[in-house]
Regions:
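Metallocofactor- and cofactor-centric catalytic cores in central/energy metabolism, strongly enriched
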Residues: 1-86
């Protein structure tokens, strides 16, 4: 899948990216030569993990923490209220 314009990492320090379109489970995305396989469907406008985020660790967007993982979040997983607290 060509991942051009389907998602964005807003800041280089972010451990998340935002889906610009709805993305399907098992899609393989390329970010600067790094490949990511999505573990679940990601709705448009929602975040997914670019790296494993351990329970209690910061979820980073805009280069700053926006919340904390309430459980381990594997790379390629959807990040939302079910696994993150602000």
């Amino acid at each position: 899948m060509d991942s051009t314009h389907t998602f964005i990492q807003i800041h280089p320090k972010d451990n998340t990216a935002v889906a610009l379109t709805s993305l399907k489970k098992d899609s393989v995305l390329n970010l600067d030569g790094r490949m990511y396989t999505l573990l679940e469907d990601i709705p448009q406008g929602h975040k997914f993990a670019l790296e494993k985020i351990s329970a209690g660790s910061a979820v980073i967007k805009y280069g700053s923490p926006i919340g904390y993982a309430t459980e381990d979040i594997p790379a390629g997983s959807w990040i939302h209220t079910h696994n993150m607290k602000t």
